[in-house]
Amino acid sequence: MSTLKADTIVAADGSSPVTLTKQTTVKSYAKGSDAAVLAHSHNVSSGTDNGGGDYSYALTNAMSSADTAVVVTPYTNISRAGINNPNRDTASVMAGVILNPYSGAYSDMPHTMIQTGDLA
């Protein structure tokens, strides 16, 4: 591991302060049989089970944009998983885990949700 010691860090122009981006990955794991109970999380304050396989998570720190990349992976051999979030916002993320691709029916199951993007 390296150590960086500096009194001042400046941008490439030599005089202005460096603009640092505040990027992070949001990660949560929920068992969704009765509620979106968090087993492990980063930047997620709580989870809500909105009905069969339909979960939403409140973020501790808002994202800078509602257009973020979200991936949901179930811990079972199902046909597919996806995001059902028609009303995106910067303070929460919604995860829908789909059991049957033919009927589009949701099913409660343990899953991992990962969201990437810039914090506000």
Which positions does each model-derived feature cover?
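Intrinsic low-complexity, repeat-rich intrinsically disordered segments enriched
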Residues: 1-40
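Extracellular attachment/recognition segments
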Residues: 26-120
